Amino acid sequence: MDENKQKALAAALGQIEKQFGKGSIMRLGDNRAMDVETISTGSLSLDIALGAGGLPMGRIVEIYGPESSGKTTLTLELIAAAQREGKTCAFIDAEHALDPVYAKKLGVDIDALLVSQPDTGEQALEICDALARSGAIDVMVVDSVAALTPKAEIEGEMGDSHMGLQARMLSQAMRKLTGNLKQSNCMCIFINQIRMKIGVMFGNPETTTGGNALKFYASVRLDIRRTGAIKEGDEVVGNETRIKVVKNKIAAPFKEANTQIMYGQGFNREGELIDLGVKHKLVEKAGAWYSYNGDKIGQGKANACNYLREHPEIAKTIDTKLREMLLSPAQPEAPAAGEKPEQEEEF
C-alpha cells in the first residue's frame, strides 16, 4: 500500500475509533485478546468436542433435539458451572416448565438464578435484550424457541393462520441481540425443538422451529440425542446420550461427544474421566480393574467412578491432564518466510 493510502487509512481508523470507541475496528491478526472466553458445559467430552473447552461468551448458541433428550439438563449444568465461576445467570422459561428441585440437584444456586416466565414471545425477547444491554448478565437461557408465541397469535382465535409470524419476530430479535450480546460479553442459549418437513423424499426431513435466522446467527449449534438407557438391574437410572456439534464458529465442527446423563444427577463426569483416561492411557485397565499411577481405584467401572467421587482431587488431576492433552491450543503465529514450522505432536 502506498504512503498516501496508508495515511488515509490511518485517518479513517482514527476517526472510527474516536466516534465509536476503541476496538470498534481492528486488524484480525493484531489482537491476541480476541481468544474467545468459554464456560464449561459440565461434560468433559463435550468440552473437548467443542474444541475450545466450552461454549463461547458473547455469542448465540442453539441446542436442539427430540423430547427428553437432555437439552434443559445441559443448560442447567452450564448455569451451575457459570455460577461456580461467580457469573450471573438468567433463565427465560417460556415453556413454564422449569423444575427448581431438579435444578438444585444439578448444582444450580436457585437463590441467585434470575427467572422470567413471559406471556408472549415479544415479551421474552425484550427481556433478553434488556438483560443483555444491562451488561450485568453473563449467561441467558431461553427455553424454548417453540414456546415463543407471538402476541397476535395469543390474542387471535384458535384456528387463525399466522404464517411466518414467529420467524419474523425471531429474525428481528437476532439482529438486535447479536451486537448487544457481543458488547456485554453475555452468552445467550436458545433451546429448540424438532419438527418434520412435509414431503421430503431425500435427505433429512427434520428441521427446527422459528425459521432460519437463528441457524445463521448462532455461533454454535448442538444436536443432542438419547441413544440408549442405563440400567441398574431392571431399573432405568439414566440415558446414554450423543451430542453432535452441528455448527461451530470457534473451532472445527462436526465432532461428537458420547456421554451419560444420570437421572437426578446430571452428567456422569467420573464415567467420562474413566473412559477418556483409558483411551488416552492416563488410567490403566487390566481385566475388570482400573488403576491410576499404579494404585488400583476400583474393580468395574461403577466402583472406579465411586472412588473418583470420594477422591475429588484425583478426579481433578485427571480432568486437568485430559484438557491439556486434548483441547485445541491457541493458533501459533505463522512462521517467517524461509522458516520451517515446528512439527506438531499428535495425541
From Swiss-Prot:
UniProt-listed InterPro entries: AAA+_ATPase, DNA_recomb/repair_RecA, DNA_recomb/repair_RecA_CS, P-loop_NTPase, RecA-like_C, RecA-like_N, RecA_ATP-bd, RecA_C_sf
Record-linked PROSITE patterns: RECA_1 (PS00321), RECA_2 (PS50162), RECA_3 (PS50163)
Cited PANTHER family: MITOCHONDRIAL DNA REPAIR PROTEIN RECA HOMOLOG-RELATED (PTHR45900:SF1), RECA (PTHR45900)
Family of this protein: Belongs to the RecA family.
Chain's role: Can catalyze the hydrolysis of ATP in the presence of single-stranded DNA, the ATP-dependent uptake of single-stranded DNA by duplex DNA, and the ATP-dependent hybridization of homologous single-stranded DNAs. It interacts with LexA causing its activation and leading to its autocatalytic cleavage.
NCBIfam families to which the protein is assigned, alphabetical: tigrfam_recA (TIGR02012)
Name by which UniProt lists this protein: Protein RecA
Organism whose genome encodes this protein: Vibrio parahaemolyticus serotype O3:K6 (strain RIMD 2210633)
